[in-house]
């Protein structure tokens, strides 16, 4: 093996360049990689709550755009109702108020646009007693 060919690898400028690239990869903000995943909800998944009015709070793993996000409620009759999103308490949270709910099984369906530009969706089934 010719040592003259590989000695350029250990030169200080090359080591510094590798360190900079590794530093950028390790410490760069992760916002661009983070889809909005639901991390907490009120009502909770498969929970039982008292009606007729229910406060909704959905917390996600990253910032979301409320203007391009939707909430709908599937009621016990199988009908889908649009839910109005209230002002955001924080960039990762959606809130709303559900009123006039009767006893039965419901599913809160959500679709959010995350800061990374990806749309994620899901549902939170719950019961009203």
PLM regions and their residue ranges:
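Bacterial N-terminal signal peptides that target proteins for export
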Residues: 2-18
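Cleavable N-terminal signal peptides
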Residues: 20-21, 32
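A glycine-anchored, Pro-Gly-centered beta-turn/N-cap motif
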Residues: 97, 102-108
